[in-house]
């Protein structure tokens, strides 16, 4: 039976992640650098040598984690798909007692970049103008997102046709905002929320629903929507 010393020699050592130049990085590090370059300058900036310089790593370090630039670009698309499409679909499925509350759940995406990244969305859609492959990915994402929004309306009793139209209204308005790079103060955007909800659903949201929404996006508890734009409380159901 081998002794402890010989057992150590028999165990294969994990390959080191350093070379003469230092740390090789990691897949996530290279992907994050690619993301930053895409957001800042578009897909043409996502190239191995500039990324290596950005990370202060050797060019050859890249090939420890990705076969080539194409594989890195595929990883960027997958990251966008998982983050933005994934988040939107989760929000359409989130618990809600009313369609107004369900729409407010979706609006979380428009106010929280950790959920839905508008800069990433803009960059991918700009890239799609140059690439049929990426355009196809965007079209697939659009279909999935619209289906998710339509199903959300159907859960609350809307017919197929009107659910589809309302879903498109919500989605295409927001994609339009992103595409033309609209910049508005957060307070103004928040003040418009109840009116967007009513426009998209045909029903005014209740104060309790708006307050829950605000609690997720406003740190200052003194912020009140009705101090900016008056909101009418819908009448309560007769008991």
Describe the residue ranges of each PLM region.
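Helix-turn-helix
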Residues: 29, 37-75
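Hydrophobic/aromatic-rich alpha-helical bundle segments in the mid-to-C-terminal region
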Residues: 155-216
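N-terminal intrinsically disordered/low-complexity leader segments
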Residues: 1-25, 204-239
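Hydrophobic/aromatic residues within well-ordered alpha-helical segments
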Residues: 69, 76, 80, 84, ...
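Hydrophobic alpha-helical connector segments
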Residues: 89-122, 167-170
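Short helix-capping/turn signature of helix-turn-helix
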Residues: 66, 112, 124-130
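Amphipathic alpha-helical packing segments from all-alpha helical-bundle domains
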Residues: 117-122, 132-158, 162-168
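Generic hydrophobic, amphipathic alpha-helix propensity
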Residues: 23-35, 51, 76-84
């Amino acid at each position: 039976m081998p002794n402890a010393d010989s057992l150590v020699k028999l165990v294969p050592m994990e390959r080191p992640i350093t070379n003469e130049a230092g740390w090789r990085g990691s897949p996530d590090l290279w992907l994050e650098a690619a993301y930053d370059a895409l957001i800042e300058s578009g897909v043409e900036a996502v190239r191995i040598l500039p990324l290596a310089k950005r990370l202060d790593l050797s060019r050859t370090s890249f090939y420890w984690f990705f076969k080539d630039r194409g594989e890195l670009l595929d990883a960027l698309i997958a990251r966008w798909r998982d983050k933005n499409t994934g988040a939107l679909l989760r929000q359409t499925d989130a618990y809600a007692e009313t369609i107004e509350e369900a729409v407010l759940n979706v609006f979380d995406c428009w106010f929280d970049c950790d959920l839905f990244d508008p800069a990433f969305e803009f960059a991918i859609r700009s890239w799609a103008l140059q690439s049929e492959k990426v355009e196809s990915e965007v079209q697939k994402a659009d279909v999935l997102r619209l289906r998710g929004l339509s199903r959300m309306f159907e859960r609350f009793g809307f017919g197929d046709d009107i659910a589809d139209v309302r879903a498109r209204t919500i989605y295409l308005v927001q994609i339009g905002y992103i595409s033309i790079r609209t910049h508005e103060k957060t307070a103004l955007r928040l003040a418009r929320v109840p009116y967007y909800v009513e426009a998209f659903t045909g029903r005014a949201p209740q104060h309790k629903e708006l307050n829950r929404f605000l609690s997720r996006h406003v740190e200052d508890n003194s912020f009140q929507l009705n101090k900016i734009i008056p909101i009418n409380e819908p009448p309560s159901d007769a008991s």
